[in-house]
Amino acid sequence: DYLIALGLTSPFEGNGNDTQAAQEMALDRIKQLSAHEVGHTLGIAHNFAASENERASVMDYPHPKLTIVNGEISLEGAYDKGIGSWDKHAVAYGYQDFASISDEQEGLAKIVVKGRNAGLAFKSDTDTRSSRHGSSNGHMWENGDDPLDAFDHISEVRRLALDNLGLNTLPANAPLSSLENALVPIYLLHRYQVEAVAKQVGGLVYEYERKGDYTTPQGQTFVAPQVQQRAMQQLI
């Protein structure tokens, strides 16, 4: 992450050597990863749909959330701090105490309904990890609730970073050949968002539905035709 941050910001112009933002981004990623692994020790599965709910879970694989401010790439808030609303929901479901079995069944059902009413989405490994899976949501290493808009944004960030990549990316006395180390992750910065876009083509919209969740089962539908067409245009 530190290398990516340097490639995004190229902070060594002239005598410049302010890498504070890059260091903070890298440390925030380590903190997020630590919380992620603690979540696994608690038995919580990956939730790759969390990035579509305002980064609702540390159990996602997060891509740094990058912004452009006054024509420059900002690393502020690249990684979220603390646990998210999905994490609290999962812990409440898994660790809440109830006085009796009947109370437990009723209480757990209420927790599920509360999470659904809050708009919390969940997709885990079996439906999302491979590019062959048909789910149109729940992607690794991406951001936002609209993968096509997110692709346009990360492509603009990538273009700006590549335009600035050069001598200012390297600290003093660094070998020029080491520029390739920063080039590769920046050149491929949009690669995971491309996968999210590709899954819109012929992709399915569905959730993990149980009997009784809805008056009429929701089932599954295909991604809207206009969304699929836009996705194909982006891929081309």
Q: Each predicted region: which residue ranges?
A:
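Catalytic Zn2+-binding segment of zinc metalloproteases
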Residues: V38-E52
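Conserved catalytic/binding loops enriched for acidic/polar residues
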Residues: Q20-A21, S51-I236
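Active-site proximal loops enriched in glycine and acidic residues that flank catalytic Cys/His/Asp
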Residues: I30, H46, A50, H63
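Metzincin-family zinc-dependent endopeptidase catalytic domain
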Residues: D1-T41, P64-I68
